[in-house]
A protein has these predicted regions:
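Solvent-exposed beta-strand/loop surfaces of large extracellular or lumenal domains
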Residues: 15-50
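Short, small-residue-biased leader/transition segments that mark boundaries at the very start
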Residues: 2-9
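Secondary-structure boundary elements
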Residues: 62, 67-71, 76-77, 82-156, ...
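Intrinsically disordered, low-complexity acidic/polar segments
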Residues: 6, 20, 70-74
Length: 194
């Protein structure tokens, strides 16, 4: 719920349909306002613009639906959006490699040259090494924490693992980008995830 006199809200609450993720049904409801525009962003995500009714103090946006997901161990297939893949080789403020991440990149280069099962296996190994280096711990980092800072303190959450992973993947000359969404936990709870 949000409080205010009048506002326009941008939301991305509809899952992207892919070969691994099929939307069976999905509904976005706006109480205290209405969806005035549904469009698609440059990644192919559905985006809504919602206006709050001027005579209400609160707007509540909820979504509900069913998604059939096929587990492909993180392999999504061919690139299918309009942004050229080399764009995802560029570092961001949160994914600049420092000494720890550069060292992990060197270690992974050695792993790959030793022929341990190809690129996909190497990227799964990178994921495992990042998880080992950054122990999952809430409250130790925030949205401004860089990948190198997470490696330095050795703790973080999903976003920190992702930033470290994409930083090293880019050092290895792979195109990699941050993707966020929602994660359904085993106990039925949902949380933001990356």
């Amino acid at each position: 719920s949000l409080v205010g006199s009048e506002m326009c809200i941008r939301d991305s609450l509809k899952p992207l349909g892919t070969t691994q993720q099929h939307l069976m049904d999905w509904d976005v409801e706006v109480n205290g306002g209405k969806i005035v525009l549904e469009t698609v962003d440059y990644h192919g995500n559905t985006v809504h613009l919602c206006n709050q009714y001027s005579d209400v103090e609160k707007i509540e946006i909820t979504c509900c639906g069913r998604v059939n997901v096929i587990d492909t161990n993180g392999i999504v297939g061919a690139h299918d959006n309009h942004i050229p893949l080399p764009m995802f080789k560029n570092a961001t403020a949160l994914s600049l490699p420092g000494p720890r991440l550069r060292q992990l990149g060197k270690d992974m280069s050695k792993f790959m040259r030793a022929g341990h099962g190809g690129e996909i296996n190497a990227l799964h190994e990178l994921s495992a090494r990042v998880s080992a280096a950054i122990k999952y711990s809430k409250g130790k980092t925030d949205t401004s924490t860089t990948a190198e800072m997470s490696m330095e303190i050795g703790m973080g959450v999903c976003q920190d693992h992702v930033h470290a992973f994409i930083t090293v993947a880019r050092c290895l000359d792979y195109s990699a980008r941050y993707v966020s969404g929602y994660l359904l936990m085993c106990d039925g709870e949902t949380q933001d995830a990356s």
